[in-house]
Amino acid sequence: MNKLILGSEEVPQICEKCLGTSNTNENIRMNEVPNGAACKICTLPYTLYHFKKSHRSADIIKTLICKKCAIQRNVCQCCMLDMKLHISIQLRDKLMSIVSGKETITEEAKNIMMKKFIAMKGGSLGSADLTRNVDSIEDILLNLREKLEGKPLNDENEPISALQNKELGDNPHLKSVDIQPYWDKFPLQETFPNAIQIPKGNDSFKSFFIYNIDSSVPEWKISDKITELLGSDSWKTKESIPIIINHKAMCGAFRIGNNELSEKFLQTINNSDNMIRINRSNGLRRGILKVDHFQLFIIPWKQGFSVESFGRTPNESKKIAFALREIIVEEMGGFKDKNDRCKAKEKPKKITKKSKKRVKSIKI
C-alpha cells in the first residue's frame, strides 16, 4: 500500500482502495484544508483532505465526510463504503441482519439539527461494530455462507432462495399494511411540462417527486446533481427541508426555493435530449435525473410533500417500493426517447394463406 505524508498528526479514515497500491511504494502527499468543506452527512465543517494516488494520476481524490461520521459508521471518508467489506452501508446492514438474526439499520436523521446532534454524540451506528473488528470478519462471512446455503432465515423457516423469489406484495407482514393514503397523494398521473407549458412565476412547479432511486445512491449525490444543473446551491431553503429521500420506499422529493430557479430547472431538463422520456401508452412525460449510471424519474408535485409522505413505518415504505417497482416496469416498457421520431406502426395487413392447388393423381 502507498505511504501517507501528512502535515499534521491526525490521520483520516481512508480505505486501501482509495489510497491505491503501488509496486514502487511511492509516498502519497495529502493536502490538508482545515474547515475546508461541510460534511455530506452531518453538514458540520471538517478538515478536508485531497490527494492523488500517484504522481502520474490526473484524478484528485478528496474526503466527503468528517472523521466522526466515518468512525460512527465504520466507512471510508472518500468512497463512504465499509472499511473492511467495501460495500455500501445499506447492503452491509442487510447482510449483518441476516447473520445476527436481528435487524440492524443505520438510521439517518431527517433534519439538520438532529444530524449535527448525532455526529457530536459519537458512538457507533447500525452494524459498524460488527465489521470494525478484524477478527470477526471471517466468522461473519462463514455465518453468512451458511445462511445462504439454505438455512432458515425467519420464524416461518422460509429459505433465503424462497424469500428472494417471493413477491414483496405477498409477504404476510405487508398484506395488512395500507399505503392508499400515501399512494393517492403521489403525482403519478402528472406529466413533466414541456418548454412551452412552463408558466412564469408559478409556485406549482417548485416541488418535485423523484422515484426509481437505487439504495446505493445517497441523498447528497442527488442534491449535488440538482445543484450542478442549476449552477447554484441557493435552491435549498432554510425555512423547510429542501430534499427528502426514503431509500426503503425507492422515492423521495425535493423543493426548489424560488420561482426563477425552478423555471431554470424545468428548462434545463427540457433542453437536454436525453433527459426527457415519454410514455407511448398514455403520453405522460418524465424528467430524468442522471446520477452515476442510474436514471431517476422526476414529476412536478403541485401538492407538495412532508417527511411522512413516504410512509411512517418501514413496512409502509417497503410496500410503497413494491408498488412503485410495478409502475417503473410498466413505464420503462412504454417509454421512448424525446427524439424518437419513429412513425406509428401501420396495422399489419391480413395475410391470407394461398389455397393449395390440388394435384391430380396420374396413373402411369
From Swiss-Prot:
Sorted alphabetically, which InterPro entries does this protein's record hold?
Cwc2/Slt11, Slt11_RRM, STL11/RBM22-like_N
Q: Which cellular component, as a GO term, is one annotated location?
A: U2-type catalytic step 1 spliceosome
Superkingdom of the organism of origin: Eukaryota
Q: Name the segments for region: Disordered.
A: 339-364
**Which pairs of Cys residues are joined through disulfide bonds in the record?**
none
User: Where is it located?
Assistant: Nucleus
Q: Which UniProt keywords apply?
A: mRNA processing, mRNA splicing, Nucleus, RNA-binding, Spliceosome
GO MF term list = pre-mRNA binding; U6 snRNA binding
Q: Which CDD domains match?
A: RRM_SLT11 (cd12265)
Name the Pfam families on file: STL11_N
Per the UniProt entry, what are the Gene Ontology biological process annotations, in alphabetical order? mRNA splicing, via spliceosome
Q: What PANTHER family does the record point to?
A: PRE-MRNA-SPLICING FACTOR RBM22 (PTHR14089:SF6)
Subunit relationships: Associated with the spliceosome.
Recorded protein name is Pre-mRNA-splicing factor SLT11
Lineage of source species = Eukaryota, Fungi, Dikarya, Ascomycota, Saccharomycotina
Gene behind this chain?
A: SLT11
